[in-house]
Amino acid sequence: MILLIDCSKGLNLILGNRKKIIQTLNKPRIKKVSEALVAEIENLLNSASKSYKDLTKIIVINGPGSFTGVRTGVTVAKVLALSLNIPVCGI
């Protein structure tokens, strides 16, 4: 399972595999991405009946966009990848 994190403008999450998109979340006008990101990832996984252990890769958008949003997304992606021992890729 692949998780894509895009906080460059608002909050966008995509959960999928190589063949299809399983679940998405799009909140373009969210104010505090740093406070909502982890909770929204958990909500996305729960709505797809998945857990963190199902993730095999994380992809994160590393710009251009909101400096704070991009920094938050990259930090959360790196922490998740490190704790789950899975690869992370910035694009």
Question: Locations of the language-model features?
Answer:
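DPxDG-like acidic metal-binding loop motif
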Residues: 57-62, 67-88
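N-terminal beta-alpha supersecondary unit
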Residues: 1-57, 62
